[in-house]
C-alpha cells in the first residue's frame, strides 16, 4: 500500500462510533497520527455502555418502523434492506478484527438471539402479515416465520403468553439470526486495541473545549485536562466529532455553517430491569412491537434479553424522560446553552410542530413505576412489581433541523452525519441505529473527509470489509457467503 502524506487527525469521543472511526483510520497508514480525547475516565461510559442501551443488533429483523405501509397497502422494505446491509458491514469489520487478533473473545460482545415482532389488534395483525409476505420474498429476510397461532407464540415467547387471556387478535414473526450486542464491551475492546497503536494517542479525562479553523484550513483544537485543568492546543488536518449528546455543542463551537438551523432535544431512556432469575430464564429473544398510533418511533416498546458480563438479564422499555442534560454525565445548562440566535427559530418551529412528541415526553416523565408496570403487563400479563426495578439508561439528543422537504423544525429520527463544506470536519448526531451501523459511519468519514487519500485507505477497507463497494441487497450469493463468514469469525454458530 502506498503511503499517504502525514496527517494529524483528532477524534472526539471514545464511544462505539469514535473508537470504530479511530480503529479504521489507525490501520490506513502509520503516517496518520490520531489524537483521541474522551471527557470521562474510560471508553464507552455514556450511551455506548451496556447498561445505557437495549443492545439490539439493528438489522431490521424485528423493528417494524423500518418497513412502511404505503397508501396502496403495499409494504416498502427498502429501508429495512439498507439497515440490514449496514449491519452486515459492521459484522464484517468486527469479524475481521477478531480474525486478525486485534480483538478477542467475540462472545463477550455479541450473542445469537432470535428477533421477534409481536402485535395485537386487527390493523396491526394485518400489517405484520403483509410485512411477512413482503420480507419472505427477499433473500436477506427469507428465514422469517409468521404465526397467528397462540400455541406457536407460546413456544416462541412462553413468558409473554403465560396466563394471557384469549380473544385478542395477535400475531408474531420471528427470525432466528438476530443478535444481542454489548456495545460497551466492544467499545472497550476497540479502545484497548487503540491504546497499543504507536500512531494513536488516546487520553481520558480530557475535554475538547474549543475548535477554531485557521486560514490554512487546519483546526486548532483546545483540550482541557479535567483533573489538572491544564489546556493544550492540538493542530489537526481533520476532526471527527463522535461525542454523543455533546456533538451539537462542539459543532456549534466550531463555527462551521452547518451548525445553523440545527438543534437538539435531549431525552433519557428508562428501562424496567428484571431482578428475578426465575423470570429471566423464561425469555430468550428480543421482542419489538409497533408504536402506539400517532406516537413517534422512539416509543416502540421492546422486551430484551441481554447478556452482560456473562450473565443473562431482561429489560423492558424504553420509557422516555425529558431533562436539560445532553449527556448522562452532562450539565443542566446543556439545552439552554445550545439555543443560539441562528437556531432559535428552528427550535421554536419544532415546538409548535411537535406538540404530540412533547406531550408524549411529559406524559412519560410523570409516569410512575406503577404506570410503567401496567405497560409491561401488555407484554407480560403476570409481571409483578417486586420482580422489576426502574432505572435511567443513556441520553439521546433528537436532532432538530430545517429541511427543504419537511420545513422548519423537523425532528430527525435516526442518525445524522454533518460535514463541513471543505470536509475537514464531520460530526455524528442523533440516535438509533447508530451503534449497529457504525461501520457505515466509518465509510462515510473516509469517502467524504479523505477522498483524496482513497489510494491509501481503499485497500485497507476492502481487507476489513470485503464487500465494500458491492451490494448485498442485489447479490444473494455474496450476501449468504458473507453471513456464513461473519458468523464463523464472530463465533455465532453456537
Swiss-Prot record:
HAMAP family: MQO
One annotated GO biological process: tricarboxylic acid cycle
Cofactors (names): FAD
Oxidoreductase is among the record's keywords: yes
Enzyme class: oxidoreductase
Organism encoding this protein: Staphylococcus epidermidis (strain ATCC 12228 / FDA PCI 1200)
Reactions the enzyme catalyzes: (S)-malate + a quinone = a quinol + oxaloacetate
Keyword Flavoprotein part of the UniProt annotation: yes
InterPro entries: FAD/NAD-bd_sf, MQO
SUPFAM superfamilies to which the protein is assigned, alphabetical: FAD/NAD(P)-binding domain
Gene Ontology MF terms: 2-hydroxyglutarate dehydrogenase activity; L-malate dehydrogenase (quinone) activity
Family membership: Belongs to the MQO family.
Protein name: Probable malate:quinone oxidoreductase 3
Pathway per the UniProt entry: Carbohydrate metabolism; tricarboxylic acid cycle; oxaloacetate from (S)-malate (quinone route): step 1/1
Keywords carried by this UniProt record: FAD, Flavoprotein, Oxidoreductase, Tricarboxylic acid cycle
